[in-house]
Protein backbone atom coordinates (compact mmCIF):
# COMPACT_ATOMS: atom_id res chain seq x y z
CA UNK A 1 0.00 0.00 0.00
CA UNK A 2 1.12 3.59 -0.61
CA UNK A 3 1.87 5.70 2.47
CA UNK A 4 3.36 9.13 1.86
CA UNK A 5 4.07 11.94 4.28
CA UNK A 6 2.35 14.54 2.10
CA UNK A 7 0.57 14.84 -1.21
CA UNK A 8 3.07 15.23 -4.05
CA UNK A 9 2.18 17.87 -6.62
CA UNK A 10 5.02 17.34 -9.07
CA UNK A 11 5.17 14.68 -11.81
CA UNK A 12 8.65 13.45 -10.85
CA UNK A 13 7.76 13.32 -7.14
CA UNK A 14 4.60 11.33 -7.87
CA UNK A 15 6.59 8.81 -9.89
CA UNK A 16 9.23 8.52 -7.17
CA UNK A 17 6.53 7.79 -4.60
CA UNK A 18 5.30 4.93 -6.78
CA UNK A 19 8.86 3.61 -7.08
CA UNK A 20 9.28 3.63 -3.30
CA UNK A 21 5.97 1.86 -2.79
CA UNK A 22 6.25 -0.91 -5.42
CA UNK A 23 9.87 -1.05 -6.64
CA UNK A 24 9.71 -4.63 -7.94
CA UNK A 25 6.38 -4.28 -9.73
CA UNK A 26 6.47 -4.12 -13.55
CA UNK A 27 6.19 -0.50 -14.66
CA UNK A 28 6.49 -0.53 -18.45
CA UNK A 29 6.20 -3.21 -21.13
CA UNK A 30 7.13 -2.62 -24.78
CA UNK A 31 7.32 -5.63 -27.07
CA UNK A 32 9.35 -8.31 -25.32
CA UNK A 33 11.03 -5.80 -22.99
CA UNK A 34 9.82 -4.91 -19.53
CA UNK A 35 11.21 -2.83 -16.67
CA UNK A 36 10.21 -2.61 -13.03
CA UNK A 37 9.52 0.66 -11.24
CA UNK A 38 12.98 0.48 -9.65
CA UNK A 39 14.66 -0.13 -13.02
CA UNK A 40 12.67 2.65 -14.67
CA UNK A 41 13.80 5.07 -11.99
CA UNK A 42 17.45 4.02 -12.07
CA UNK A 43 17.62 4.45 -15.83
CA UNK A 44 15.84 7.82 -15.66
CA UNK A 45 18.22 8.94 -12.87
CA UNK A 46 21.24 7.96 -14.95
CA UNK A 47 19.97 9.86 -17.98
CA UNK A 48 19.13 12.88 -15.85
CA UNK A 49 22.65 12.99 -14.41
CA UNK A 50 24.13 12.63 -17.90
CA UNK A 51 22.03 15.52 -19.17
CA UNK A 52 22.90 17.64 -16.13
CA UNK A 53 26.59 17.07 -16.86
CA UNK A 54 25.96 18.56 -20.30
CA UNK A 55 24.32 21.74 -19.08
CA UNK A 56 20.69 20.73 -18.75
CA UNK A 57 19.04 22.15 -15.65
CA UNK A 58 15.86 23.74 -14.29
CA UNK A 59 13.85 25.30 -17.10
CA UNK A 60 15.88 23.69 -19.90
CA UNK A 61 13.88 22.27 -22.82
CA UNK A 62 14.65 18.71 -23.96
CA UNK A 63 13.12 17.31 -27.15
CA UNK A 64 11.90 13.70 -27.18
CA UNK A 65 11.78 12.53 -30.80
CA UNK A 66 10.61 8.93 -30.68
CA UNK A 67 7.86 6.47 -31.27
CA UNK A 68 6.43 4.74 -28.20
CA UNK A 69 9.25 3.15 -26.25
CA UNK A 70 10.62 2.66 -22.78
CA UNK A 71 13.38 5.14 -23.59
CA UNK A 72 10.88 7.84 -24.57
CA UNK A 73 9.18 7.57 -21.20
CA UNK A 74 12.53 7.47 -19.37
CA UNK A 75 13.61 10.63 -21.19
CA UNK A 76 10.50 12.51 -20.10
CA UNK A 77 10.94 11.40 -16.50
CA UNK A 78 14.63 12.36 -16.56
CA UNK A 79 13.70 15.87 -17.65
CA UNK A 80 11.15 16.29 -14.86
CA UNK A 81 13.63 15.03 -12.27
CA UNK A 82 15.91 17.93 -13.24
CA UNK A 83 13.01 20.43 -13.19
CA UNK A 84 13.62 20.62 -16.94
CA UNK A 85 10.87 20.38 -19.56
CA UNK A 86 10.33 17.50 -21.98
CA UNK A 87 9.03 18.60 -25.39
CA UNK A 88 7.16 16.15 -27.62
CA UNK A 89 8.47 16.03 -31.21
CA UNK A 90 6.15 14.65 -33.88
CA UNK A 91 8.04 11.89 -35.71
CA UNK A 92 6.12 12.63 -38.92
CA UNK A 93 7.51 16.15 -39.22
CA UNK A 94 9.59 17.10 -42.24
CA UNK A 95 12.54 19.47 -42.26
CA UNK A 96 10.72 22.81 -42.05
CA UNK A 97 8.41 21.63 -39.29
CA UNK A 98 11.30 20.23 -37.25
CA UNK A 99 13.28 23.44 -37.67
CA UNK A 100 10.29 25.47 -36.50
CA UNK A 101 9.65 23.27 -33.47
CA UNK A 102 13.29 23.00 -32.37
CA UNK A 103 13.59 26.79 -32.57
CA UNK A 104 10.19 27.72 -31.16
CA UNK A 105 10.57 25.32 -28.24
CA UNK A 106 14.12 26.57 -27.49
CA UNK A 107 15.52 23.04 -27.33
CA UNK A 108 18.98 22.75 -25.79
CA UNK A 109 19.08 18.94 -25.82
CA UNK A 110 17.42 16.17 -27.81
CA UNK A 111 16.82 12.46 -27.32
CA UNK A 112 15.92 10.78 -30.61
CA UNK A 113 15.64 7.33 -32.12
CA UNK A 114 18.45 6.47 -34.51
CA UNK A 115 16.08 6.17 -37.49
CA UNK A 116 15.71 9.98 -37.45
CA UNK A 117 19.46 10.70 -37.64
CA UNK A 118 19.38 12.09 -41.19
CA UNK A 119 16.58 14.53 -40.33
CA UNK A 120 18.37 15.66 -37.18
CA UNK A 121 21.67 16.09 -39.04
CA UNK A 122 19.94 18.31 -41.59
CA UNK A 123 18.21 20.58 -39.08
CA UNK A 124 20.93 20.99 -36.42
CA UNK A 125 22.97 23.61 -38.35
CA UNK A 126 19.85 25.81 -38.34
CA UNK A 127 19.14 25.42 -34.61
CA UNK A 128 22.27 26.64 -32.79
CA UNK A 129 20.69 26.55 -29.32
CA UNK A 130 20.49 22.75 -29.49
CA UNK A 131 23.86 21.65 -28.09
CA UNK A 132 23.55 18.03 -26.95
CA UNK A 133 22.00 14.97 -28.61
CA UNK A 134 21.43 11.46 -27.24
CA UNK A 135 20.58 8.69 -29.71
CA UNK A 136 18.47 5.60 -28.95
CA UNK A 137 19.55 2.51 -30.89
CA UNK A 138 16.35 1.24 -32.52
CA UNK A 139 18.05 -1.26 -34.82
CA UNK A 140 18.32 1.14 -37.75
CA UNK A 141 21.61 2.25 -39.30
CA UNK A 142 21.29 6.03 -39.14
CA UNK A 143 24.60 7.90 -38.91
CA UNK A 144 24.81 10.35 -36.02
CA UNK A 145 28.60 10.73 -35.98
CA UNK A 146 28.48 14.01 -37.91
CA UNK A 147 26.86 15.84 -35.00
CA UNK A 148 28.44 14.01 -32.09
CA UNK A 149 25.37 12.19 -30.88
CA UNK A 150 25.88 10.09 -27.74
CA UNK A 151 24.57 6.53 -27.66
CA UNK A 152 21.70 6.29 -25.17
CA UNK A 153 23.04 3.29 -23.25
CA UNK A 154 26.49 4.88 -23.11
CA UNK A 155 24.90 8.00 -21.64
CA UNK A 156 23.17 5.89 -18.99
CA UNK A 157 26.41 4.11 -18.12
CA UNK A 158 28.06 7.50 -17.54
CA UNK A 159 25.30 8.78 -15.25
CA UNK A 160 24.83 8.17 -11.54
CA UNK A 161 21.87 5.97 -10.51
CA UNK A 162 21.29 8.06 -7.38
CA UNK A 163 18.17 10.10 -6.65
CA UNK A 164 20.04 13.18 -5.46
CA UNK A 165 18.23 15.98 -7.24
CA UNK A 166 17.22 19.41 -6.04
CA UNK A 167 13.81 19.91 -4.45
CA UNK A 168 11.06 20.27 -7.01
CA UNK A 169 7.90 22.37 -7.06
CA UNK A 170 4.22 22.19 -7.96
CA UNK A 171 5.00 25.24 -10.11
CA UNK A 172 7.45 23.38 -12.35
CA UNK A 173 6.43 23.55 -16.01
CA UNK A 174 5.04 20.81 -18.24
CA UNK A 175 4.71 21.56 -21.97
CA UNK A 176 2.61 19.72 -24.53
CA UNK A 177 2.93 20.81 -28.14
CA UNK A 178 -0.32 20.65 -30.09
CA UNK A 179 -0.62 18.67 -33.30
CA UNK A 180 -0.62 21.72 -35.51
CA UNK A 181 -3.45 20.61 -37.85
CA UNK A 182 -4.64 24.24 -38.01
CA UNK A 183 -1.19 25.82 -38.38
CA UNK A 184 2.19 25.48 -36.73
CA UNK A 185 2.16 23.63 -33.41
CA UNK A 186 1.94 25.60 -30.19
CA UNK A 187 3.32 24.68 -26.79
CA UNK A 188 0.69 24.58 -24.06
CA UNK A 189 2.18 25.55 -20.67
CA UNK A 190 0.92 23.77 -17.56
CA UNK A 191 2.05 23.86 -13.95
CA UNK A 192 2.77 20.30 -12.75
CA UNK A 193 0.05 20.46 -10.12
CA UNK A 194 -2.50 21.78 -12.60
CA UNK A 195 -1.92 19.05 -15.18
CA UNK A 196 -2.14 16.40 -12.45
CA UNK A 197 -5.35 17.87 -11.04
CA UNK A 198 -6.85 18.36 -14.51
CA UNK A 199 -6.40 14.63 -15.11
CA UNK A 200 -8.21 13.81 -11.87
CA UNK A 201 -5.17 13.41 -9.63
CA UNK A 202 -5.96 13.61 -5.93
CA UNK A 203 -9.61 14.34 -6.69
CA UNK A 204 -12.70 12.32 -5.81
CA UNK A 205 -14.33 11.67 -9.21
CA UNK A 206 -17.83 11.57 -7.67
CA UNK A 207 -17.73 14.81 -5.66
CA UNK A 208 -15.00 16.70 -7.50
CA UNK A 209 -13.36 17.52 -4.14
CA UNK A 210 -9.72 16.99 -3.19
CA UNK A 211 -9.06 13.83 -1.20
CA UNK A 212 -8.67 14.68 2.49
CA UNK A 213 -5.33 13.01 3.05
CA UNK A 214 -2.58 11.00 1.44
CA UNK A 215 -3.94 7.72 2.82
CA UNK A 216 -7.14 8.16 0.78
CA UNK A 217 -5.11 8.86 -2.35
CA UNK A 218 -2.98 5.82 -1.59
CA UNK A 219 -5.95 3.47 -1.95
CA UNK A 220 -5.83 4.05 -5.73
CA UNK A 221 -2.55 2.14 -5.93
CA UNK A 222 -3.38 -0.59 -3.47
CA UNK A 223 -3.68 -3.52 -5.87
CA UNK A 224 -1.66 -2.26 -8.83
CA UNK A 225 -3.59 -4.63 -11.06
CA UNK A 226 -5.04 -2.16 -13.54
CA UNK A 227 -2.85 -2.79 -16.59
CA UNK A 228 -3.24 -0.05 -19.19
CA UNK A 229 -2.36 0.13 -22.86
CA UNK A 230 -2.40 3.61 -24.43
CA UNK A 231 -2.37 2.90 -28.17
CA UNK A 232 -1.88 6.52 -29.21
CA UNK A 233 1.69 7.79 -29.67
CA UNK A 234 3.46 9.45 -26.73
CA UNK A 235 3.73 12.62 -28.80
CA UNK A 236 0.01 13.00 -28.02
CA UNK A 237 -1.48 14.05 -24.69
CA UNK A 238 -3.88 11.09 -24.66
CA UNK A 239 -0.99 8.61 -24.39
CA UNK A 240 1.16 10.70 -22.04
CA UNK A 241 -1.72 11.28 -19.64
CA UNK A 242 -2.86 7.65 -19.69
CA UNK A 243 0.70 6.47 -19.04
CA UNK A 244 1.36 8.88 -16.19
CA UNK A 245 -2.05 8.20 -14.68
CA UNK A 246 -1.15 4.53 -14.48
CA UNK A 247 2.38 5.00 -13.17
CA UNK A 248 1.30 7.45 -10.47
CA UNK A 249 -0.83 4.68 -8.93
CA UNK A 250 1.76 1.93 -9.34
CA UNK A 251 0.05 0.33 -12.33
CA UNK A 252 1.83 -1.14 -15.36
CA UNK A 253 1.78 0.54 -18.78
CA UNK A 254 1.99 -1.48 -22.00
CA UNK A 255 3.17 0.11 -25.26
CA UNK A 256 3.23 -0.99 -28.87
CA UNK A 257 5.97 0.93 -30.74
CA UNK A 258 3.56 2.00 -33.47
CA UNK A 259 -0.15 1.51 -33.98
CA UNK A 260 -0.88 -1.86 -35.55
CA UNK A 261 -4.27 -3.30 -34.69
CA UNK A 262 -3.12 -6.92 -34.57
CA UNK A 263 -0.10 -6.01 -32.43
CA UNK A 264 -2.40 -4.18 -30.02
CA UNK A 265 -4.58 -7.27 -29.56
CA UNK A 266 -1.48 -9.46 -29.11
CA UNK A 267 -0.24 -7.09 -26.42
CA UNK A 268 -3.67 -7.12 -24.76
CA UNK A 269 -3.66 -10.91 -24.72
CA UNK A 270 -0.04 -11.39 -23.62
CA UNK A 271 -0.17 -8.78 -20.83
CA UNK A 272 -3.79 -9.18 -19.70
CA UNK A 273 -4.48 -5.50 -20.37
CA UNK A 274 -7.51 -4.16 -18.53
CA UNK A 275 -7.87 -0.62 -19.90
CA UNK A 276 -7.30 0.07 -23.59
CA UNK A 277 -7.00 3.78 -24.44
CA UNK A 278 -7.34 4.85 -28.07
CA UNK A 279 -8.31 7.94 -30.08
CA UNK A 280 -11.77 7.62 -31.61
CA UNK A 281 -12.96 5.71 -34.65
CA UNK A 282 -9.66 6.06 -36.52
CA UNK A 283 -8.14 3.49 -34.15
CA UNK A 284 -11.35 1.69 -33.19
CA UNK A 285 -12.32 0.53 -36.67
CA UNK A 286 -8.98 -1.19 -37.48
CA UNK A 287 -9.09 -2.79 -34.01
CA UNK A 288 -12.59 -4.14 -34.62
CA UNK A 289 -11.57 -5.58 -38.00
CA UNK A 290 -8.40 -7.13 -36.57
CA UNK A 291 -10.30 -8.69 -33.67
CA UNK A 292 -12.69 -10.32 -36.12
CA UNK A 293 -9.82 -11.58 -38.26
CA UNK A 294 -7.76 -12.96 -35.40
CA UNK A 295 -8.28 -15.31 -32.51
CA UNK A 296 -7.46 -13.10 -29.54
CA UNK A 297 -8.24 -13.44 -25.86
CA UNK A 298 -9.47 -10.04 -24.68
CA UNK A 299 -11.29 -11.31 -21.60
CA UNK A 300 -9.03 -9.22 -19.34
CA UNK A 301 -10.32 -5.91 -20.71
CA UNK A 302 -12.80 -4.07 -18.50
CA UNK A 303 -12.85 -0.74 -20.35
CA UNK A 304 -12.11 0.71 -23.78
CA UNK A 305 -11.64 4.46 -23.55
CA UNK A 306 -11.37 7.11 -26.24
CA UNK A 307 -9.51 10.33 -25.45
CA UNK A 308 -9.55 13.46 -27.63
CA UNK A 309 -12.10 12.08 -30.13
CA UNK A 310 -15.49 10.54 -29.45
CA UNK A 311 -16.52 7.11 -30.68
CA UNK A 312 -19.38 7.08 -33.18
CA UNK A 313 -22.46 5.16 -32.07
CA UNK A 314 -21.90 2.48 -34.72
CA UNK A 315 -18.38 1.82 -33.42
CA UNK A 316 -19.59 1.55 -29.83
CA UNK A 317 -22.20 -0.98 -30.84
CA UNK A 318 -19.66 -3.02 -32.82
CA UNK A 319 -17.25 -3.05 -29.88
CA UNK A 320 -19.97 -4.15 -27.48
CA UNK A 321 -21.15 -6.88 -29.82
CA UNK A 322 -17.61 -8.31 -29.85
CA UNK A 323 -16.75 -7.56 -26.20
CA UNK A 324 -20.07 -7.46 -24.33
CA UNK A 325 -18.33 -7.51 -20.95
CA UNK A 326 -16.55 -4.15 -21.37
CA UNK A 327 -17.51 -0.57 -20.61
CA UNK A 328 -16.96 1.99 -23.38
CA UNK A 329 -15.98 5.49 -22.27
CA UNK A 330 -15.58 8.78 -24.13
CA UNK A 331 -13.45 11.51 -22.56
CA UNK A 332 -13.58 14.97 -24.10
CA UNK A 333 -10.88 17.55 -23.69
CA UNK A 334 -7.84 19.01 -25.36
CA UNK A 335 -4.20 19.91 -24.84
CA UNK A 336 -5.45 23.24 -23.50
CA UNK A 337 -8.08 21.94 -21.09
CA UNK A 338 -7.27 18.44 -19.90
CA UNK A 339 -10.37 16.30 -19.39
CA UNK A 340 -13.63 18.25 -19.55
CA UNK A 341 -16.27 15.52 -19.47
CA UNK A 342 -16.83 11.79 -19.73
CA UNK A 343 -19.50 9.48 -21.10
CA UNK A 344 -19.92 5.79 -20.41
CA UNK A 345 -21.93 2.98 -22.03
CA UNK A 346 -22.21 -0.79 -21.65
CA UNK A 347 -24.22 -3.47 -23.45
CA UNK A 348 -27.27 -2.57 -21.35
CA UNK A 349 -27.17 1.15 -22.19
CA UNK A 350 -29.63 3.00 -24.42
CA UNK A 351 -27.68 3.50 -27.65
CA UNK A 352 -30.30 5.67 -29.35
CA UNK A 353 -29.29 8.87 -27.57
CA UNK A 354 -26.09 9.52 -29.50
CA UNK A 355 -22.58 10.22 -28.17
CA UNK A 356 -23.11 12.22 -24.98
CA UNK A 357 -20.91 13.07 -22.04
CA UNK A 358 -21.36 14.44 -18.55
CA UNK A 359 -19.52 17.67 -17.82
CA UNK A 360 -17.11 17.90 -14.92
CA UNK A 361 -18.00 20.43 -12.24
CA UNK A 362 -15.68 23.11 -13.68
CA UNK A 363 -17.05 22.99 -17.26
CA UNK A 364 -19.76 25.22 -18.74
CA UNK A 365 -20.95 26.45 -22.13
CA UNK A 366 -20.55 30.09 -23.15
CA UNK A 367 -21.73 31.98 -26.21
CA UNK A 368 -19.44 33.58 -28.79
CA UNK A 369 -19.26 36.74 -26.65
CA UNK A 370 -18.23 34.85 -23.51
CA UNK A 371 -21.60 35.02 -21.74
CA UNK A 372 -22.84 31.97 -19.83
CA UNK A 373 -25.21 29.72 -21.81
CA UNK A 374 -28.11 28.61 -19.64
CA UNK A 375 -28.11 24.79 -19.24
CA UNK A 376 -31.31 23.91 -21.09
CA UNK A 377 -32.12 21.38 -23.82
CA UNK A 378 -30.96 22.46 -27.27
CA UNK A 379 -28.72 25.30 -26.08
CA UNK A 380 -25.42 25.44 -28.00
CA UNK A 381 -22.21 27.08 -26.89
CA UNK A 382 -18.45 26.88 -26.61
CA UNK A 383 -17.01 24.56 -23.98
CA UNK A 384 -15.22 26.51 -21.25
CA UNK A 385 -13.34 25.13 -18.26
CA UNK A 386 -12.02 26.82 -15.13
CA UNK A 387 -9.98 25.63 -12.17
CA UNK A 388 -6.75 23.83 -12.98
CA UNK A 389 -6.06 25.14 -16.48
CA UNK A 390 -2.83 25.99 -18.33
CA UNK A 391 -0.84 29.18 -17.93
CA UNK A 392 -1.12 29.80 -21.67
CA UNK A 393 0.82 29.18 -24.87
CA UNK A 394 4.61 29.27 -24.95
CA UNK A 395 5.84 32.50 -26.57
CA UNK A 396 2.39 33.37 -27.94
CA UNK A 397 0.70 36.03 -25.79
CA UNK A 398 -1.84 36.93 -28.50
CA UNK A 399 -3.15 33.38 -28.74
CA UNK A 400 -3.08 33.07 -24.96
CA UNK A 401 -5.22 36.19 -24.58
CA UNK A 402 -7.72 34.83 -27.11
CA UNK A 403 -8.16 31.36 -25.58
CA UNK A 404 -7.76 32.09 -21.86
CA UNK A 405 -10.45 34.54 -20.80
CA UNK A 406 -12.13 35.91 -17.69
CA UNK A 407 -15.82 35.09 -17.19
CA UNK A 408 -17.65 36.39 -14.13
CA UNK A 409 -14.32 37.12 -12.46
CA UNK A 410 -12.89 33.63 -13.00
CA UNK A 411 -10.24 32.49 -15.48
CA UNK A 412 -11.47 30.01 -18.11
CA UNK A 413 -9.94 28.25 -21.07
CA UNK A 414 -12.13 28.25 -24.20
CA UNK A 415 -10.34 26.06 -26.82
CA UNK A 416 -13.04 26.52 -29.49
CA UNK A 417 -15.14 23.35 -29.30
CA UNK A 418 -18.92 23.67 -29.54
CA UNK A 419 -21.38 21.44 -27.68
CA UNK A 420 -25.14 21.19 -27.16
CA UNK A 421 -27.12 20.55 -23.99
CA UNK A 422 -29.53 17.60 -24.26
CA UNK A 423 -32.79 16.83 -22.42
CA UNK A 424 -30.96 15.24 -19.49
CA UNK A 425 -28.36 18.08 -19.51
CA UNK A 426 -25.62 15.83 -20.75
CA UNK A 427 -23.80 17.41 -23.68
CA UNK A 428 -23.21 16.37 -27.28
CA UNK A 429 -19.86 17.47 -28.68
CA UNK A 430 -20.38 19.23 -32.03
CA UNK A 431 -16.79 19.95 -32.95
CA UNK A 432 -14.23 22.71 -33.39
CA UNK A 433 -15.77 25.99 -34.47
CA UNK A 434 -12.98 26.64 -36.96
CA UNK A 435 -14.12 23.55 -38.91
CA UNK A 436 -17.82 24.43 -38.81
CA UNK A 437 -19.42 24.63 -42.27
CA UNK A 438 -21.71 27.64 -42.76
CA UNK A 439 -24.07 26.64 -45.56
CA UNK A 440 -26.77 29.18 -46.35
CA UNK A 441 -26.63 30.49 -42.79
CA UNK A 442 -26.97 27.04 -41.22
CA UNK A 443 -24.08 25.78 -39.09
CA UNK A 444 -23.04 22.20 -39.80
CA UNK A 445 -20.53 20.53 -37.50
CA UNK A 446 -18.28 17.98 -39.26
CA UNK A 447 -18.22 15.41 -36.44
CA UNK A 448 -21.99 14.92 -36.55
CA UNK A 449 -21.96 14.35 -40.32
CA UNK A 450 -18.89 12.11 -40.10
CA UNK A 451 -20.71 9.96 -37.56
CA UNK A 452 -23.67 9.59 -39.92
CA UNK A 453 -21.41 8.63 -42.83
CA UNK A 454 -19.43 6.11 -40.79
CA UNK A 455 -22.60 4.43 -39.56
CA UNK A 456 -22.99 3.01 -43.10
CA UNK A 457 -21.48 -0.51 -43.21
CA UNK A 458 -19.43 0.18 -46.37
CA UNK A 459 -17.74 3.35 -45.03
CA UNK A 460 -14.50 2.86 -43.11
CA UNK A 461 -13.60 6.50 -42.46
CA UNK A 462 -14.68 9.99 -43.48
CA UNK A 463 -13.80 13.66 -43.11
CA UNK A 464 -16.32 16.45 -43.70
CA UNK A 465 -15.30 19.88 -44.96
CA UNK A 466 -16.85 23.02 -46.40
CA UNK A 467 -16.07 24.02 -49.99
CA UNK A 468 -17.01 27.30 -51.73
CA UNK A 469 -20.52 27.54 -53.19
CA UNK A 470 -21.82 30.51 -55.20
CA UNK A 471 -25.31 30.35 -53.71
CA UNK A 472 -24.80 29.09 -50.16
CA UNK A 473 -21.34 30.45 -49.39
CA UNK A 474 -20.21 26.93 -48.48
CA UNK A 475 -21.51 23.51 -49.30
CA UNK A 476 -21.05 20.42 -47.17
CA UNK A 477 -18.56 18.00 -48.73
CA UNK A 478 -16.88 14.77 -47.64
CA UNK A 479 -13.83 12.68 -48.40
CA UNK A 480 -14.66 9.02 -47.79
CA UNK A 481 -12.54 5.91 -47.37
CA UNK A 482 -14.66 2.88 -48.35
CA UNK A 483 -14.29 -0.31 -46.35
CA UNK A 484 -11.72 -2.64 -47.91
CA UNK A 485 -13.24 -4.91 -50.55
CA UNK A 486 -16.51 -2.96 -50.71
CA UNK A 487 -17.95 -1.14 -53.72
CA UNK A 488 -19.56 1.96 -52.29
CA UNK A 489 -23.04 2.74 -53.64
CA UNK A 490 -23.11 6.54 -53.39
CA UNK A 491 -26.88 6.82 -53.85
CA UNK A 492 -27.49 4.25 -51.12
CA UNK A 493 -25.05 6.10 -48.85
CA UNK A 494 -26.90 9.38 -49.37
CA UNK A 495 -30.24 7.72 -48.63
CA UNK A 496 -28.79 6.21 -45.45
CA UNK A 497 -27.32 9.50 -44.25
CA UNK A 498 -30.68 11.24 -44.76
CA UNK A 499 -32.15 8.89 -42.17
CA UNK A 500 -29.47 9.98 -39.68
CA UNK A 501 -29.28 13.78 -40.04
CA UNK A 502 -31.23 16.72 -41.49
CA UNK A 503 -31.12 17.19 -45.25
CA UNK A 504 -29.10 20.42 -45.20
CA UNK A 505 -26.28 18.56 -43.42
CA UNK A 506 -25.98 15.82 -46.07
CA UNK A 507 -22.77 16.17 -48.14
CA UNK A 508 -23.44 17.48 -51.64
CA UNK A 509 -19.98 16.64 -52.99
CA UNK A 510 -18.12 13.39 -52.32
CA UNK A 511 -14.57 12.24 -52.94
CA UNK A 512 -13.27 8.70 -52.48
CA UNK A 513 -9.77 8.11 -51.09
CA UNK A 514 -7.72 4.98 -50.45
CA UNK A 515 -6.85 6.27 -46.99
CA UNK A 516 -8.01 9.24 -44.96
CA UNK A 517 -5.33 11.64 -43.77
CA UNK A 518 -4.95 11.73 -40.00
CA UNK A 519 -2.27 12.62 -37.46
CA UNK A 520 -0.26 9.81 -35.82
CA UNK A 521 -2.69 9.94 -32.90
CA UNK A 522 -5.71 9.51 -35.17
CA UNK A 523 -6.90 13.11 -35.11
CA UNK A 524 -8.53 14.36 -38.33
CA UNK A 525 -6.34 16.29 -40.76
CA UNK A 526 -8.84 18.70 -42.30
CA UNK A 527 -6.22 20.64 -44.31
CA UNK A 528 -5.34 17.31 -45.97
CA UNK A 529 -9.02 16.81 -46.87
CA UNK A 530 -9.20 20.29 -48.38
CA UNK A 531 -6.07 19.62 -50.46
CA UNK A 532 -7.37 16.24 -51.56
CA UNK A 533 -10.67 17.77 -52.68
CA UNK A 534 -8.90 20.50 -54.64
CA UNK A 535 -6.60 18.03 -56.41
CA UNK A 536 -9.10 15.28 -57.31
CA UNK A 537 -12.40 15.02 -59.11
CA UNK A 538 -15.44 14.28 -56.94
CA UNK A 539 -17.45 11.12 -57.58
CA UNK A 540 -20.71 13.01 -57.21
CA UNK A 541 -21.98 16.58 -57.05
CA UNK A 542 -25.57 17.17 -55.98
CA UNK A 543 -27.39 20.50 -56.38
CA UNK A 544 -26.89 22.68 -53.31
Set out the residue ranges of the language-model regions.
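Conserved AMP-binding A3 loop
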Residues: 36-38, 173-201, 205-208
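Structural core segment of the AMP-binding/adenylate-forming
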Residues: 53-54, 82-154
Amino acid sequence: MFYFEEVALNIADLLEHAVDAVPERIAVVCGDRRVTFAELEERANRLAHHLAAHGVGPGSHIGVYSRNSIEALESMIAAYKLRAIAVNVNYRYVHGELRYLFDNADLVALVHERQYSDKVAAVLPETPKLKHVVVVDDGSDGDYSSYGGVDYETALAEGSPERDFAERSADDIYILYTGGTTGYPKGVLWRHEDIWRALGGGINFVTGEYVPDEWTLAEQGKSGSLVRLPAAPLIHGAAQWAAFGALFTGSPVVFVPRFDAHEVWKAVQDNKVQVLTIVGDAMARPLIDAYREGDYDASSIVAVSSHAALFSQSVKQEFLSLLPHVVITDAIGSSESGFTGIGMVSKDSDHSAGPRVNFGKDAILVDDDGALVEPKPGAIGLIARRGHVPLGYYKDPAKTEKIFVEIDGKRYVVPGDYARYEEDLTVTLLGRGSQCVNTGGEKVYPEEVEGALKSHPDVFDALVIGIPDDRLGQRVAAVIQPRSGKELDVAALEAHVRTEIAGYKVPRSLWLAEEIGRSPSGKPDYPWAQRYASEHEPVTIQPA
